[in-house]
């Protein structure tokens, strides 16, 4: 069994969830988020692209309904003992099979919370669930319950986060060895991802973002590779990933001599990062974090070039994204708590001058000032050859 946490850790998590369920007066929950299943049981798969559901009750039952392809996956990677299979066939309805399973679990008329807000729940499944369960039980949206619990990391989780951060640093060191005029983006990506795999890391929740020249202004991955010019810019956003826990980083590297605009934008990003660090303390909100970022950026005249969010929580995430909640945007009332892992990204994209500048790193919050998990310098990275 490939469990990455102690039995005591899993028991503590289930106890936390049952306490929240009791407070919310829920008899059971239907878990569709792969992150929830991994956190609660260790179950590790990308099989959530198909229908699967983990039913948990306040009495302590855990029953997984999944496909045959994931039966052994659940046995090998989780502490779930009751694994049931829905059958692939022409008129198969896993929702009806789930309803029958809930009846067998004596949950007719129960109060059941459902995880709707997750990539493991399609609109079609949601419609079918609502149609079948509305008259069967008292159902409600419980999407935020486990994410709120996952946001604060345990000591066992923090060990993996620190390892992910170490791998993220190694990935950037590997990239800097490759970045030069004439370098191919493919070799840079290969070096970064190779450093993480060689260090025992995992695939991240989404692709690494890489773009040079005009495409250095992009915040998402896209297909196609480019060779760096004599004077160029390349934006990298990547994450070390270990046991699915992420530590993200972001840098724009200047190839050749930085322009005055690069220097101006870097100064704004550096000041903004310093400002948000003062807000990464218990009692502040994720809205406060964003406000600190916006104030510094706007003071440098960067309002039209910045984004409307400047970071987010990180943890054990699955595709299609390593981004977790809460997110730092204006007015978000979510509170900063000790032992959160938060990625702060200062992103400036000036389409007028075709200039990019980014600066980002991951922090662990404490009872006081935050701890940066990276050992990389915050200087503007420049490669001249």
Question: Which sequence ranges carry the predicted segments?
Answer:
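Active-site neighborhoods and metal-handling regions in enzymes and metal-associated proteins
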Residues: 1-385
